[in-house]
């Protein structure tokens, strides 16, 4: 139904939800300029996770862009980061909510990578892919649906935008859990992959700090009186590195070790910082157990030392289930009609907020933002022509849920 405009839906009722989805897809045609203008406004504001003022400015822009009939906005205050945002619609009675999840923070501190730039068919800038582009996709899909039958015709929507995803969502995870409880599906609009592949699996992530304690002594006069914390920690590092199991998708990386004060002093203190990745919740729990066991064994081999292990699982994995595979197929059919790819992505090593929804038992898929490359680098870009079809795919999917 070409030619629809935001003010033309008054009194108009779509005969079927499929027609509503097609009307929304038609409404989006020719609106790339609007979408790009909104994206540029978001990208031009630095919203590094620790830039609270910048994050709040981006949040204010999002609230303006999402000021739609039937969509309420809630600001969830933060004491550490920019405020988190939760948008809700009442939706059609009898239908379970659908959750849409994103984040407004980026990884670039002020001065590192700034501004929005056009480069032929590409658009470059901090967060253009990860993931302000995804937020624009969500926003314009909802605008199209509001203009083509109204959000009240859809399932209840729960849109959550957190401000701390890039540091593991220490606050945002709880905001998400509270907002989307009872949802029947969760779609996450992180960076779109090559071929528009849909993410159904992400590794879980963890972090651990091992602190070795020993006894200082002069290395020449009283070596025998010391207890070498670095030696105990070295034994620990060797043990935990051997827990890596590539066929099972388990990796351990001891990325930083510090300790000691000089070559002529037996060190009484040493610290190792460790990254953990795993594919199943059971593997994550087992890794934490084996870490603590390795610490005990390593210290027992160096009399007078002990090793304390802090940390553990930070994000549960996004695990593929029959329900998430069905969700991928349903969304994928809408993506295909919209001219996009709809295959399944390979296992992804990094975590996202899809892991939070998945751990709640909610079928979840990810990577639905605009197609691009280079997230977390100064080469970050999107293919601008994917903005409209990505929004069309979401609009068609949400309409299909109400049919």
Where in this protein do the model-derived segments appear?
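Acidic/histidine-rich catalytic neighborhood of metal-dependent amide-processing enzymes
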Residues: 131-203, 245, 402-403
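Metal-dependent amide/peptide-bond hydrolase catalytic core
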Residues: 18-23, 30, 47, 70, ...
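Short beta-strand segments
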Residues: 101-102, 160-162, 187-190, 211-213, ...
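Acidic/His- and Gly-rich active-site-bordering loop/insert found
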Residues: 18-126, 147-153, 354
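Glycine/charged-rich beta-loop-alpha catalytic/anionic-binding loops adjacent to active sites
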Residues: 114-128, 213-216, 339, 375
């Amino acid at each position: 139904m070409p030619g629809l405009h935001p003010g033309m839906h008054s009194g108009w009722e779509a005969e079927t939800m499929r027609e509503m989805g097609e009307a929304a897809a038609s409404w989006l045609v020719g609106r790339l300029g609007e979408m790009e203008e909104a994206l540029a406004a978001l990208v031009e504001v630095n919203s590094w996770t620790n830039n609270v003022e910048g994050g709040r400015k981006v949040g204010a822009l999002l609230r303006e862009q999402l000021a739609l009939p039937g969509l309420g906005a809630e600001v969830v205050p933060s004491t550490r980061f920019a405020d988190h945002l939760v948008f809700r619609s009442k939706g059609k009675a009898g239908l379970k909510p659908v959750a849409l999840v994103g984040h407004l923070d980026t990884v670039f501190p002020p001065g590192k990578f700034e501004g929005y730039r056009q480069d032929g068919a590409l658009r470059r800038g901090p967060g253009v892919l990860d993931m302000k582009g995804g937020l624009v996709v969500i926003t314009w899909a909802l605008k199209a649906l509001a203009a083509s039958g109204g959000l009240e015709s859809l399932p209840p929507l729960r849109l959550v935008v957190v401000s701390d995803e890039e540091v593991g969502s220490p606050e945002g995870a709880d905001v998400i859990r509270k907002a989307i409880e009872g949802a029947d599906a969760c779609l996450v609009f992180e960076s779109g992959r090559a071929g528009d592949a849909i993410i159904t699996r992400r590794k879980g992530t963890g972090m651990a700090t091992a602190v070795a304690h020993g006894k200082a002594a002069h290395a020449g006069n009283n070596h025998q009186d010391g207890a070498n914390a670095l030696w105990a920690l070295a034994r620990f590092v060797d043990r935990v590195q051997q827990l890596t199991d590539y066929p099972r998708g388990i990796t351990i990386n001891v990325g930083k070790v510090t300790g000691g004060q000089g070559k002529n002093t037996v060190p009484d203190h040493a610290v190792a910082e460790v990254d953990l990745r795993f594919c199943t919740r059971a593997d994550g729990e087992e890794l934490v157990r084996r870490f603590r066991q390795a610490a005990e064994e390593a210290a027992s081999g160096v009399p007078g030392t002990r090793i304390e292990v802090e940390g553990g699982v930070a994000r549960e994995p996004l695990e593929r289930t029959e329900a998430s595979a069905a969700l991928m197929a349903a969304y994928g059919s809408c993506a295909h009609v919209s001219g996009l790819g709809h295959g399944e992505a390979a296992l992804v090593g990094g975590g996202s907020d899809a892991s939070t929804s998945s751990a709640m038992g909610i079928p979840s898929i990810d990577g639905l933002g605009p197609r691009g490359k280079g997230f977390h680098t100064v080469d970050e870009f999107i293919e601008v022509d994917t903005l409209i079809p990505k929004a069309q795919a979401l609009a068609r999917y949400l309409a299909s849920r109400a049919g």
